[in-house]
Each structure stands twice: as structure tokens, then as C-alpha cells.
């Protein structure tokens, strides 16, 4: 009798220990799990099962949409991404074109059916193309080249306020975001602005940070801190080649766009994915068609994840 009781106690103890260990394992984030109901309610407030995203910006939000779509699909999340693009467009120009109804945008849609473009659109038309869950804004990259982050914010505060008020009136359910863009690569020398070394680059990134955080605080927007992830790659991993090459089909090379070969497009997509969904990008199974080594992919995933963790801690 005592022997049976002893065996029963030992079995119960072993079961408890196994459950505890299993619980710890289940806490590890994975991108292969199906998104939870709570998560989908947050990122899909319109409830149609697809995260509908409208990015209003310029080339700094143009080139990573395919990667973002594919990373999300690998995690079991369907997205429809529409990019409102005009080259080098700054927020005051977005405002002026909206006020005057000017049709200067290219609207690029990426979804389960593929990618397609509509030329010569105005902002009102672009906004009418979906019931948006996510709408993002950003300024042109030169906005803090020759001014502080505080000055850039004050110079553009009225334009941003008007645009956000209009968007919120038209899409009250949508979550609004501001993308914090990145500093140019060391070696950039154009229009009198030079990034001669890592210190100048770091200062430029800090001005972008101040501008973005000021906008988000003033207008209650979520921040997508792409620029912070870039600085982590540069400062922690010693890699400053993210701008190495733009889209291969366009054949452009420069010191400021997110390049495919350099990994900038993949890095940006990882940051956006984590900020929008709350899921870790670490371990995501999507691999780009351009050549990135597994070591590079692991580094970019870690940098994106660290940046978003910093963001979450700062805004907790």
C-alpha cells in the first residue's frame, strides 16, 4: 500500500515538472504559430481577415513591401499593402497636393494576387481604395539634414496636424503610424550635406529620432523605428552597407535607399512586421530572392527585434 502511494506521489511530481518545463518552452516566440484572436483584433480592426495597410510617403517606404508581405504570410498573417509614392516627397508637399487635389502619386498595391500600379493619383483617390487598418506617414529624408529634430517638427507641425485630422475623420478605426527613417550611409556627399564618418551619421540618426518621437507624442501616433534598427546594425554589428544597392530592376545605386543586396529592404520589413503584429521576426522562414546569407538574415532579424524591444520599453 505504502509502495503504491509512493509511486503515485512520484508520478504526480514528475507530471508537474514536465508541465512546468513545457510552459517555459511555449513562452519562446515563434513565427510559425497562428495569430491569436486578440492579435488580429488589434491589427485588423475592420475585421475582414486581412491587414490593410496604406503607406503615404516616398521611396523610403517603397522598396520593402514585397518582403513585408512575404514575412507576414510566413507567419500566417495576410496583408494588403498599398504604397502612395512620390519621389523625395516631404510632408509639406503631401499637404499641398492634398489641399489642391493634385495627382502626382503612384499607387502600388501588393497582395495575394500580386503587385500592380496606378499612375497619377491624388491622395483622396488613394485613401478611397480600401478600408484601412493601418495608415502610415513619414517625412522626406532631407528634413533634418540642416536642422534639428525639434526645428523639423515645429516647421511641419501644421501640415502633419491637418493631414492626421483628415485621415482620422475618414478612417476612425485605423491605427496611425509614423516611420522614423534612417541616416544616410557614410560617404554620402550631395547638396552640401556630407556623412563623412560614423559620428555624423549618428547625429543625423538622433535628429530623425527626435523628430519622429515629437510627432508621435504630439499626435498620438505609433512609431515605426526603422532608423533605430539601422543604427543597431551599424553600431553593434559594424555593418554600414545597407544602402549598397537599390532594386535590381531599376539598377540604381546610392547612399540612402534601402538596398536589396545590402539587406536594408529585409531589415525594414522585419521592423514593420514586429511593430504592426507584435510577433517576433526571429526565426521567420521567409527568404528573399536576392542573396542574403543565413548569417546576415539572422543578424538583421536580431537587430530589428532589438529595435522594437527598445521601442516597446520606451513606450511602456
Model feature map: region roles:
Residues 24, 219, 245-316:
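Conserved catalytic region of serine esterases and O-acyltransferases that act on ester linkages
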Residues 54-56, 179:
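Short hydrophobic segments within beta-strands
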Residues 25-47:
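N-terminal, intrinsically disordered, polar/charged segments of Gram-positive cell-envelope systems
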Residues 50-52, 80:
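Residues that mark the start of a beta-strand
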Residues 1-7:
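Positively charged n-region of N-terminal signal peptides that target proteins for export
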Residues 63-157:
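Conserved SGNH/GDSL esterase-like catalytic core that processes O-acyl groups on lipids
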